[in-house]
UniProtKB/Swiss-Prot annotation:
Inducing stimuli: Up-regulated during adipocyte differentiation. Up-regulated by starved state in white (WAT) and brown (BAT) adipose tissues. Down-regulated during fasting in WAT and BAT. Up-regulated during cold exposure in BAT.
One of the GO biological process terms: intracellular glucose homeostasis
Top-level taxonomy: Eukaryota, Metazoa, Chordata, Craniata, Vertebrata
Keywords noted in UniProt: Cytoplasm, Nucleus, Phosphoprotein, Repressor, Transcription, Transcription regulation, Transferase
Modification Phosphothreonine, positions: T93
Stated name of the protein: Foxo1-corepressor
Organism of provenance: Mus musculus (Mouse)
Span list, region Disordered: 1-44
Assembly behavior: Interacts with FOXO1 (via N-terminal domain); the interaction is direct, occurs in a forskolin-independent manner that prevents SIRT1 binding to FOXO1. Interacts with FOXO3. Does not interact with FOXO4.
Keyword NAD attached: no
Function: Regulator of adipocytes that acts by repressing FOXO1 transcriptional activity. Acts by promoting acetylation of FOXO1, both by preventing the interaction between FOXO1 and SIRT1 deacetylase, and by mediating acetyltransferase activity in vitro. Regulates insulin sensitivity and energy metabolism.
Listed EC numbers: 2.3.1.-
Record note on what altering L81A does: Enhances FOXO1 nuclear translocation but does not abolish inhibition of FOXO1 transcriptional activity in the absence of forskolin
Motif (Nuclear export signal): 78-87
Tissue expression summary: Expressed in adipocytes. Expressed in brown and white adipose tissue but not in liver. Protein levels in brown and white adipose tissues decrease following fasting (at protein level). Expressed in white and brown adipose tissues. Expressed in adipocytes. Not expressed in liver, skeletal muscle and brain.
Length: 106
């Protein structure tokens, strides 16, 4: 329709969403979560991370209004998705996929 969309491949290089302009500073109502795509993780033990667990193999919508998505890798692959979730609105403000050998930050 309108042109090529920014779609992250399920296999390939990782790319982080957001930057200094969209990064939220830690504060009341904000908490950093992380989980790996390979099996259970620490986030699974956090009650507030239930939504993230449900989204673990689905596109994740960042709450910065950009409408961009980051796609998780296939089950069994090595990668980590970092999400800063606003506990008040239950929306993520940053997400970043890290693959083996790739470094990145939200």
């Amino acid at each position: 329709m309108g042109g090529p969309t920014r779609r992250h491949q399920e296999e390939g290089s990782a790319e982080c969403l957001g930057g200094p302009s969209t990064r939220a500073a830690p504060g009341p109502g904000l908490r950093d979560f992380h989980f790996t795509t390979a099996g259970p993780s620490k986030a699974d033990r956090l009650g507030d991370a239930a939504q993230i667990h449900r989204e673990r193999m689905r596109p994740v919508q960042c709450g910065d209004g950009s409408g961009e998505r980051v796609f998780l890798q296939s089950p069994g692959s090595i990668g980590t998705l970092y999400i800063r979730l606003d506990l008040n609105s239950q929306r993520s403000t940053c997400c970043c996929l890290l693959n083996a050998g790739t470094k990145g930050m939200c």
